[in-house]
Amino acid sequence: MTIGVVGRKCGMTRIFTEEGVSIPVTVIEIEPNRVTQFKTEETDGYRAVQVTVGERRASRVTAAQAGHFAKANVAAGRTVMEFRLEDGDYQAGDLINAEIFAAGQLVDVTGQSKGKGFQGTIKRWNFRGQDNTHGNSVSHRVPGSIGQCQTPGRVFKGKKMSGHMGAERVTVQSLEVVRVDAERNLLLVKGAVPGATGGNLVVRPAAKARG
């Protein structure tokens, strides 16, 4: 896995090319990612870099976390993320920002999707509705049969039914980086990314583009 960064979703807008073509983009703020720990095969059994981003009040930091951040000589952040590494070398206190990406590069963006609460099968799984007329009554949005009879005598695991929708980890792959604004720590990515405005995002070089 290649090094990535943790950012914050700012929202969507559009930019225009020199030919006048409108491109919808998501603006991602890449605050400086502070390295809190560099893991090696000798000490941890694998190579990885651990980063934190943002700020957190001292009253919200546990004693163990405070000691970990103090050892790395970095300020406490709102979240901690780890990236596996195949090569490269980092030291605690190093900064990683949007400059590791370039315009035209493909990236994978991971975030938590918007929570929709408890939803029925039509919204959750795109089931079709039943007839509005022809004798149908009070069953316009019900899923219908969910199984068989005495054999097997149960509902199979994984059956698509009503339930909680959204609020889960989602990755959108191979999005194009349209622009990198290193001065303002902004990354403009073509298209939409998961989650609500203000949510944390993990941006990595695209897995499928790395071969």
Curated annotation (Swiss-Prot):
SUPFAM superfamilies linked to this entry: Translation proteins
InterPro entries: Ribosomal_uL3 (IPR000597), Ribosomal_uL3_bac/org-type (IPR019927), Ribosomal_uL3_CS (IPR019926), Transl_B-barrel_sf (IPR009000)
Biological processes per GO annotation: translation
GO cellular component: cytosolic large ribosomal subunit
Keywords: Methylation, Ribonucleoprotein, Ribosomal protein, RNA-binding, rRNA-binding
Pfam families attached to this UniProt entry: Ribosomal_L3 (PF00297)
N5-methylglutamine: residues carrying this PTM: 150
Modification after translation, per record: Methylated by PrmB.
GO molecular function: rRNA binding; structural constituent of ribosome
Subunit structure and binding partners: Part of the 50S ribosomal subunit. Forms a cluster with proteins L14 and L19.
Protein family per UniProt: Belongs to the universal ribosomal protein uL3 family.
Role summary: One of the primary rRNA binding proteins, it binds directly near the 3'-end of the 23S rRNA, where it nucleates assembly of the 50S subunit.
Name of the featured protein: Large ribosomal subunit protein uL3
Gene name of this polypeptide: rplC
